[in-house]
């Protein structure tokens, strides 16, 4: 067993009994949870979980220090050769870590990312096989279907027949510990920490490390209603402002190196402007989903759509 799972966490005590057990898979020697100074009963919940999972290690920041700093603390505590990056609001599908390890060894990769999916309704937690079946025929054959650097757009829901080399993957990934310690997460990425993983991973590629994407591993976000106390966050504008600010910082920091390696077709300013358009579209979509949910139509539309997939 030579994989450490790292889980930064903040005020997710009620989710941890659902998510943490899914990370104790074959090849996992420890799960490290770093509590970013939560105000809920995270410490008590973890203590109870430790009676079932003795290799669950718990650390707590003295002050709230945000996601990148907390990620770095977790990495510093790792005792294994490999790190699996988890989320406190996601479950990991059985067998995912073994499959990530197999791809890493077969491809001599430094980082391997899996699919990143999201449940829509709480009852889907007990129907993961059926949920995953909806993505079976969404097949990608080229890297730019998964990561398009010309627009910085991604789709980590695709099924692939063979692992595909990509410039970066989703945050849900297996990484060599020495690579993670060399790269480190950038603590200047603030607020909602948008682009923290993209920055970490693209810098790994720019440094000469190899990253692959596989659909044989699946990290699945819990429904947003469960993660936000029964309703989606309505502060979409604040989220978008944070995302734009962090994206601008990411582009200013990495554009020249990315341009040199990938010959990007857009200028730095064009990339920033395009992202603003994309974010505005996302916010509109979130408002529409909120409205459909309020009037009880979202679930009906979802099931009709997937009936014909």
Where would I find each of the regions flagged by the language model?
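Short aromatic/hydrophobic "clamp" motif used to bind/position activated sugar donors
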Residues: 83
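Conserved donor NDP-sugar-binding/catalytic core segment of glycosyltransferases
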Residues: 95-140
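A recurrent flexible, glycine/aromatic-enriched loop bordering the glycosyltransferase active site
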Residues: 154-175
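Glycine-rich, basic loop-to-helix element that forms the pyrophosphate-binding segment
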Residues: 61-78
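A conserved acidic beta->alpha catalytic loop
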Residues: 22, 35-45, 63, 90-93
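Catalytic core of nucleotide-sugar-dependent glycosyltransferases
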Residues: 209, 216-221, 229-262, 287-307
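Acidic donor-binding loop at a coil-to-helix junction in glycosyltransferase catalytic cores
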Residues: 170, 191-200
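Short, well-formed alpha-helical segments that are part of the catalytic scaffolds
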Residues: 11-25
